Amino acid sequence: MAAHIVTVMTKIEETLKIALEAHAGQEDLDGNPAILHPLAVGLMGNSDAEIKTGFLHDVVEDSSMTLEDLKNKGVEDEVIAALALLSHDKEKVGYFEYVENIIASGNVTAIHVKLNDLHHNLQRGKVSYEAAVASND
């Protein structure tokens, strides 16, 4: 049992290191370190996959890392599948269609992480709701 916990924690730590690397030097709309939001979303997760996906949910959109890069760094297929759904190509898909696609996928990890993402975005409250939605369109 102890070995399993160490393995799980090591994978979560590796995922956290990837997120820290990807968001190094970035700031959010409020001027805070960008990593704080993915950390909060990850810590809201109810499973290892949700924690890891939460930590990485903004990496593809907000850094030069791709899903393939993440896969090459050892990120599990379950997390990659959720990240593929959570990565929003704003040029091709409107925000509400993007959210509908996540829901329609039935991917529980992606759905929970998106809910946690929205919850944390609304909690922060410094940037208006309208500005947050506009930044996603």
Segments predicted by a language model, with ranges:
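Active-site helical microenvironments for divalent-metal-assisted chemistry
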Residues: A2-D137
